[in-house]
């Protein structure tokens, strides 16, 4: 992982202890329910995916046993493992669309363009879904899915900034 732009040691924070994650995995396995974890950034996503990767699907139907919410800047290895094990990723391209200034300030242009590698995830077989993240999105109508879809299809922010054309979806 790399730190936020202009820092040497700021990577984000973990809000879930290892013991809490283990208890969530144990509960979901016992009750055959889907584990849903929130993870943004390479380290957080790798931590969740690596832990879940050690398990076999415990669901009694074809529902993915793990859903990782808020996928932003996943490592290549996490994408591969998620595809291999049938994990489900949820991501919000609306953020690069609606909050482009923050992405450019904190990540820079090159990193921003790779934050939401949706084309790569789909091409590698990851089960993927977009969401608006309403009401947290700072857009005029947070629950409107169309700006999110527009961002995924055009890979342009509201102001026209290129957000990584190689990751467009159709």
Name what the model sees in each region.
Residues 1-32, 79:
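Active-site-adjacent helix-turn-beta-strand microarchitecture at beta-sheet edges
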Residues 26-36, 43-66, 71, 77-80, ...:
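His/Asp/Glu-enriched, well-ordered alpha-helical/loop segment
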Residues 88:
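Ligand-binding beta-strand-loop-alpha-helix segment within the catalytic cores
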């Amino acid at each position: 992982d790399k730190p936020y732009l202009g820092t040497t040691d700021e990577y984000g924070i973990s809000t879930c202890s290892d013991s809490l994650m283990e208890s969530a995995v144990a509960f979901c396995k016992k009750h055959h329910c889907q584990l849903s974890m929130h993870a943004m950034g390479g380290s957080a996503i790798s931590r969740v995916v690596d832990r879940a990767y050690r398990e076999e699907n415990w669901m009694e139907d074809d529902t993915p046993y793990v859903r990782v919410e808020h996928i932003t800047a996943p490592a290549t290895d996490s994408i591969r493992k998620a595809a291999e094990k049938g994990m489900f990723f949820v991501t919000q391209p609306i953020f690069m669309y609606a909050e482009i200034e923050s992405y450019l300030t904190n990540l820079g242009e090159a990193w921003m363009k790779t934050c939401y590698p949706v084309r790569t995830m789909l091409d590698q077989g990851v089960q993927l879904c977009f969401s608006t993240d309403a009401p947290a999105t700072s857009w005029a109508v947070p629950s409107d899915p169309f700006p999110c879809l527009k961002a995924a299809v055009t890979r342009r922010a509201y102001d026209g900034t290129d957000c990584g054309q190689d990751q467009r979806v159709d």
